[in-house]
UniProtKB/Swiss-Prot annotation:
This is ATP synthase subunit delta. The keyword Signal does not apply. It is a peripheral membrane protein. Gene3D superfamilies: N-terminal domain of the delta subunit of the F1F0-ATP synthase. Belongs to the ATPase delta chain family. Coiled coil: none annotated. PANTHER family: ATP SYNTHASE DELTA CHAIN. Its main location: membrane. F(1)F(0) ATP synthase produces ATP from ADP in the presence of a proton or sodium gradient. F-type ATPases consist of two structural domains, F(1) containing the extramembraneous catalytic core and F(0) containing the membrane proton channel, linked together by a central stalk and a peripheral stalk. During catalysis, ATP synthesis in the catalytic domain of F(1) is coupled via a rotary mechanism of the central stalk subunits to proton translocation. It comes from Mycoplasma mobile (strain ATCC 43663 / 163K / NCTC 11711). Keywords: ATP synthesis, Cell membrane, CF(1), Hydrogen ion transport, Ion transport, Membrane, Transport. Transmembrane segments: none annotated.
Length: 180
């Protein structure tokens, strides 16, 4: 029931964005909102609290978000708060972003490396895979201390690996096959 509600709110926002021909704008705003929400767990708790009056929650929302988001995004957030669903905001935003990214032909990938990669390298990898997959690819760099050197890239459930760790695995596999 709750997940259907979440999907319903996400779909409603998606339909409004589509009708207004502003899906890209809404997508960027919701991405920014999602980052803010994920970085401020206390805000989610505050705006989800049943002990704080609705008027106070709406005032908090207004003070924080009014100058940063369009009227429709702010109204959407007010509706979520008014219906006591802010505890599910992360799920609602994720569903919207998933639906919108499919419509906008955007894929997400993860670059695992032993150390933080330079933004230029990430940008070059995004461009390379965007061209290869014929869609926009946005990547997040994650640190994996088990990698000795090299990178592992995951996009759309496909793994592209060029690392010493993987090379050692392949060598072991090859040796074992030759022994049989």
């Amino acid at each position: 029931m709750i997940s259907q509600n979440n999907k319903g709110y996400a779909l409603a926002l998606f339909e409004i964005a589509n009708e207004e021909l502003k899906l890209e704008q809404y997508f960027q705003e919701v991405k920014k909102l999602n980052e803010i929400i994920n970085e401020n767990e206390d805000l989610v708790k505050l705006l989800s609290s049943k002990e704080i009056q609705l008027e106070k929650k709406l005032k908090i929302l207004e003070n924080i978000f009014t100058n940063h988001f369009t009227v429709n995004i702010n109204n959407f957030l007010k509706l979520i708060i008014t219906n006591n669903l802010f505890i599910y905001i992360k799920s609602i935003l994720k569903i919207f972003l998933d639906i919108a990214s499919k419509k906008l032909n955007i894929s997400y990938g993860k670059i695992y490396s032993s150390k933080k990669l330079d933004e230029k390298i990430i940008s070059n990898l995004e461009k390379f895979y965007s061209d290869k997959l014929s869609k926009k690819v946005e990547m997040l760099n994650l640190i994996d201390t088990t990698l000795i050197k090299g990178i592992r890239i995951e996009i759309e459930n496909t793994i592209h690996e060029n690392s010493i760790k993987n090379n050692i695995k392949e060598l072991q596999k090859s040796i074992l096959e030759k022994e049989q």
